[in-house]
Structure formats: C-alpha cells, structure tokens
C-alpha cells in the first residue's frame, strides 16, 4: 500500500483540487490511502473536510492536531501511516492521474526513492513557470536510475517522490525548523538510499507558485541569519550523528546549498 500524507492549515478551496487529483488516480483505490493532517485551528475546517471527502471512493481520512506546523503534521501522518511507500503532497499542489502508478512502477529495487516530473504553475496567470526541480528532472529523466550524488539536486524536497517506509525508518521532520526542513529530512534518510529512480514523464507533481514578497529590513536580515545558523547546525548535528555511514560529499554540498540559498533569498527580497 501507498500512503499519501497531506498537511493542511486553515485550508481553502485549493485543498479540494488536491484531493480531487488523488481521487482521479489510475491506480486501484485499495492500493493507496490518503491521510489529511489538519494542524492548528479545528473549526470550521474539520467539518468542511469531512463533508467534502464523503463523496470520494478512495481510502481517505482526516486527523487533527492543535499544534501548528507542517513538520509536526507530516510526522503525525508518518506515525499512523499503513503504507510501505510514502508520498508527501502539499495542500495547495496537485498531481497527474498517473502520478502514483508511474512512481510505483519506476521502482526496480529496494532502497530506491522514485522521483516524478514537476510543473510550477503561476497562481495568478495559471501559466507554467521555469522551475529548478523540473529542469533537474528533465536533464536526468533519460536515466532509469541514478546514484545519490547525481540525484542530490532532486533531494532538497520531500514532495514529488515516493519513499519506501524502510528508508524513512524512525527518522522524522525537525519541528524546530521553519525553513529547510525538507532538505534536512532527505539528508537524514540518505544513508539508507541506494539510488533514485526517475519515473515516467506522465507522473507530474503540479506545484502552485504563490505571489507575495517580503521587505528587506534589519528584521528580515536577522531572521535570515537565524534561519541560516539553525539550518547549518541541524545539518551538522545529523551528519556527526552517523558520520561513518553518511556520504561526505553529499552533506558538504548541503552545507554549501544552505549558505547559497540564504544569500539568494535575502538579496531577492
């Protein structure tokens, strides 16, 4: 079985589009379950979700926690999941009809994570925009499988993937991080990853690009520095916890990526 985990906080109509895309999967309904984790405020969202999912034939359930945060919600989903494979989907994103089937079919061996194509959709215009993950996938998808180092650029996000539960093990998302929690989680589990399988292009993860901007102020600079230090410390702590089994080049690449990402985000705001 495959478990799809969707964390959501005060959801809008976009959640219905996400759920509709999972109901429309070509994969047989008994082969996957969908777990919605409503985090933060319960009302009126919980009852709205219950009413909406009543029309579906897929196996879907909703759980609620008063503790806000995507990491805590994902961890809660992992703890109650029944599937041998796990997919994370953000509540404002959606997937193609063959998403689950193609991801599942692409796995040739145990210890492999399967990765899908990605399409970034502009929230305002509805147009497809250039996307980092999409460009990396397009440059590599002619390979059936690739090694950890070659796949490192794809492993900055936990979405657009199918991850075996045996690879995840007891690892969970770091609830202290407000940025970079995906990349840290993928780095944590990397010691058990033999390689990455590239799914057929029919497996597409549609990522909604939301509009918005932040002011470039002393406060934002302090926040950026704080986030940077916490991320680097978290990566270093994970790396040192099992230094013999982690790939050194992979982790040092992550340290550099955090630094580079912090500089770019600050300069762009």
Task: Locate each region found by the language model.
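A conserved hydrophobic helix/loop-capping motif in glycosyltransferases and polysaccharide synthases
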Residues: 2-14, 18, 25, 37-39
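Glycine-rich, basic loop-to-helix element that forms the pyrophosphate-binding segment
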Residues: 65-81
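Acidic donor-binding segment of Leloir-type glycosyltransferases
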Residues: 19-64
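Short aromatic/hydrophobic "clamp" motif used to bind/position activated sugar donors
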Residues: 86
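Catalytic core of nucleotide-sugar-dependent glycosyltransferases
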Residues: 203-210, 216-243
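Flexible acidic/His/Gly-enriched loops in nucleotide-sugar-dependent glycosyltransferase catalytic domains
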Residues: 57-58, 96-167
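Cell-envelope/extracellular polymer assembly enzymes that use nucleotide-activated donors
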Residues: 1-3, 21, 33, 184
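Conserved nucleotide-sugar donor-binding catalytic segment
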Residues: 143-220
């Amino acid at each position: 079985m495959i478990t799809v985990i969707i964390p959501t906080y005060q959801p809008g109509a976009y959640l219905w589009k996400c759920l509709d895309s999972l109901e429309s999967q070509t994969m047989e309904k008994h082969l996957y379950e969908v777990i919605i984790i409503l985090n933060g405020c319960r009302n009126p969202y919980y009852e709205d979700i219950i009413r909406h999912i009543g029309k579906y034939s897929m196996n879907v359930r909703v759980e609620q926690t008063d503790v806000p945060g995507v990491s805590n919600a994902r961890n809660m989903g992992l703890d109650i999941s029944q599937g041998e494979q796990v997919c994370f989907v953000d509540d404002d994103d959606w997937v193609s009809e063959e998403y689950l089937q193609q991801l599942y079919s692409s796995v040739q061996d145990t210890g492999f994570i399967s990765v899908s194509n990605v399409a970034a959709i502009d929230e305002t215009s509805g147009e497809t925009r250039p996307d980092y993950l999409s460009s990396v996938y397009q440059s590599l998808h002619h390979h059936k499988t690739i090694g950890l180092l070659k796949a490192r650029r794809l492993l900055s996000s936990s979405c657009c993937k199918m991850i075996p539960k045996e690879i995840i093990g007891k690892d969970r998302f770091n609830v202290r991080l407000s940025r970079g929690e995906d990349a840290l989680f993928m780095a944590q589990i990397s010691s058990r990853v033999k390689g990455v399988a590239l799914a057929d292009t029919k497996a597409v993860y549609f990522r909604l690009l939301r509009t918005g901007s932040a002011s470039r102020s002393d406060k934002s600079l302090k926040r950026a520095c704080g986030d940077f230090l916490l991320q680097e410390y978290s990566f270093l702590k994970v790396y040192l916890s099992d230094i013999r089994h982690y790939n050194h080049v992979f982790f040092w690449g992550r340290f550099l990526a955090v630094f580079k990402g912090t500089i770019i985000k600050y300069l762009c705001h």
